[in-house]
């Protein structure tokens, strides 16, 4: 599968994308709000779970590699995972290498993913969970129309400390109205 934006190709992850996935999960800045450092075997398990052919009626991640059109360079991953079927909800997720940050690729790719999820797949609501303190992720979601729906206090243990999780949501009607 492939989505195309002004500056990016978003392509289904393949076995050849293992080096990118490993770099993302081993970069302390990329992973610092996602998980404590993981073993290579644990990262491989997450990667392998994203390789099967995606189905909107399933429960696995649609994982798309973000590639710059002009260079072909992979700069991150983005996608979503169906949840709460048959109520047509999905959770979005993304991560960019430092070289891909600060260029607007996150917003560009997330808007394409939202368009696909809402208009091609018929999802009613998209959600995101962000660890408190991750202001870049929060800003990205809010710039795409997501609203803060609540805070789960001391919900996630990271670096030996309990952290709050911010819950964000975007209804299909809000996304379509904001295009």
Language model features: what each stretch is:
Residues 51-65:
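A short helix-loop-beta-strand connector motif used in the catalytic cores of GNAT acetyltransferases and
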Residues 38-39, 62, 133:
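Short, conserved alpha-helical segments within structured domains
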Residues 29-51:
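Conserved GNAT-fold acetyl-CoA-binding loop/helix
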Residues 1-27, 31, 66-179:
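Acyl-donor (CoA/ACP) binding surface of acyl/acetyltransferases
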């Amino acid at each position: 599968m492939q989505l195309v934006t002004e500056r990016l190709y978003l392509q289904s992850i393949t076995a050849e994308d293992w080096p990118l996935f490993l770099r993302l999960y081993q970069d302390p800045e990329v992973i610092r709000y996602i998980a404590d450092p993981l073993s290579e075997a644990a990262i491989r398990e997450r990667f392998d779970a994203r390789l099967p052919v995606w189905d909107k009626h399933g429960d696995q991640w649609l994982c798309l590699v973000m590639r710059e059109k002009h260079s072909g360079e992979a700069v991150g991953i983005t996608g979503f995972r169906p949840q709460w079927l048959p109520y047509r909800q999905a959770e979005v997720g993304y991560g960019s290498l430092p070289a891909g940050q600060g260029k607007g690729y996150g917003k560009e790719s997330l808007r394409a993913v939202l368009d696909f999820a809402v208009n091609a797949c018929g999802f009613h609501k998209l959600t995101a969970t962000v660890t408190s303190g991750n202001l870049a992720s929060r800003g990205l979601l809010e710039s795409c129309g997501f609203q803060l729906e609540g805070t789960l206090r001391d919900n996630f243990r990271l670096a030996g400390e309990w952290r709050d999780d911010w819950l964000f949501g975007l209804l299909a009607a809000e996304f379509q109205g904001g295009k």
